[in-house]
Amino acid sequence: MAGARGLLHLWLSCLCVSLAQGQRLRQPFPELRVAVPADRAAGGGPESPLQPLDQVSEHMLRLYDRYSGGRTEEARTPGNSERGSPSLRPQPLREGNTVRSFRAGAAGMLENKELHIFNLTSLTKSENILSATLYFYIRELINISLSCPVSQECSHHAQRKHIQIDLSAWILKSSGNQSQLLGHLSVDGGKPHRDFVSWLSKDITQLLRKAKENEEFLIGFNITTKGHQLPKKMTPSPEPYILVYANDAAISEPESVVSSLQGHRNFPTGAVPKLDSQSRSAPSIERRRRKRSTGVLLPLQNNELPGAEYQYKEDEVWEERKPYKTLQTQPPDKSKNKKKQRKGPQQKSQTLQFDEQTLKKARRKQWIEPRNCARRYLKVDFADIGWSEWIISPKSFDAYYCSGACQFPMPKSLKPSNHATIQSIVRAVGVVPGIPEPCCVPEKMSSLSILFFDENKNVVLKVYPNMTVESCACR
């Protein structure tokens, strides 16, 4: 009986050790753990179309969550909610404003060498490469090294040597099946052991800069090992990938967000939602809507709220426009009263009658409503504009907008510029006819991180400036 208990304790201890080692295997590369976007973690949006076991997607989701101020790290740390820690603020991107990921395509052979081919045609001329890193998986090599018996030409000394990884980069030309050596690199993988890091990385910034300067965007990498008697060829699984940090000089140009997010010609048309399905089914209704809404939308062209023109009119205008008639006391007329008694209920006046006090309250309530320049709420849903098919996260964001009047005299809260102040005075004096009042425009704006697929189905993270209105002013 005692022997059985001893064997049971020994088995349980071995099981705990193996579980602890397996947990350590996932610790050295924290950026490659599964990352859940903030909108999915909160249940505010649909699940991401990314594959759950795809290391490239996990890495990009992690970066997005970090630079968009998500709460993934906070949610994983126990006790944060109890301590009442504030929500994470978006961090500035480490380098530039763009992170592009490139996954290896179908492997090819070049002079009996296996190449992992990358298509880098998504890089634009305006994107200046700041840094580039190649990530590759070597777990299979470690397993072979640790399981190699001494009898199969794997000496004890060879097993303890450092693993040396050789990387050779090739430029693949589409014409004539030509190839050109781009460069050689080596990586010291360290000594193989049970909790060895499964992923290694190597800086390839200079290689990609050289290829981009020569406008060569089809690159192949051959990954081999040396320094011991193990097989030279290594086939990493999962496939390697590249992360490129770049600074897009054209991201602040007009309509840059439209040109980069809407230019997805290769996406299947059936997957993109059709925005004009309702207008095709009911064209007459659409025409009636356009005619009816034309007058309503006109004030918005001048940064005015609908109905704002009533604020600055005199009381006579209200008297002309009001639909109600005030009650006026008149001397009693017996003949009229007799006639009114003869009328049936169908001949009663259809105009509602209110006293003067009720009308004054309604008039005062309308004047109290905020009509000055201010920030108004606006939520943009990418599904409404047909972009949800390739935008991974966020599915929607709070954009806000500025609207309202900048009439003289403007209070300090509207933060008018000197030019806006002078313009409002000139308009109020009326010396120069036709001078409009200053406009209500955004004063401060913040950026927005967007994670999306490019035309080659690679995951891209871009930080677009001036996407959310923080405050408004008169200019």
UniProtKB/Swiss-Prot annotation:
GO terms for biological process: cartilage development; negative regulation of ossification; osteoblast differentiation; positive regulation of transcription by RNA polymerase II. Residues 346-356 have a biased composition (Polar residues). Residues 23-365 form a propeptide. It comes from the Eukaryota. Residues 68-97, 261-300, 321-358 are annotated as: Disordered. It comes from Bos taurus. Its main location: secreted. Disulfide bonds join 373-440, 402-472, 406-474. SMART domains: TGFB. Transmembrane segments: none annotated. Induces cartilage and bone formation. One of its GO terms (cellular component) is extracellular space. Residues 1-22 form the signal peptide. PANTHER family: BONE MORPHOGENETIC PROTEIN 3 (PTHR11848:SF144), TGF-BETA FAMILY (PTHR11848). Keywords: Chondrogenesis, Cleavage on pair of basic residues, Cytokine, Developmental protein, Differentiation, Disulfide bond, Glycoprotein, Growth factor, Osteogenesis, Secreted, Signal. CDD domains: TGF_beta_BMP3. The gene is BMP3. Homodimer; disulfide-linked. This is Bone morphogenetic protein 3. GO terms for molecular function: BMP receptor binding; cytokine activity; growth factor activity. Glycans are attached at residues 119, 143, 177, 222, 466.
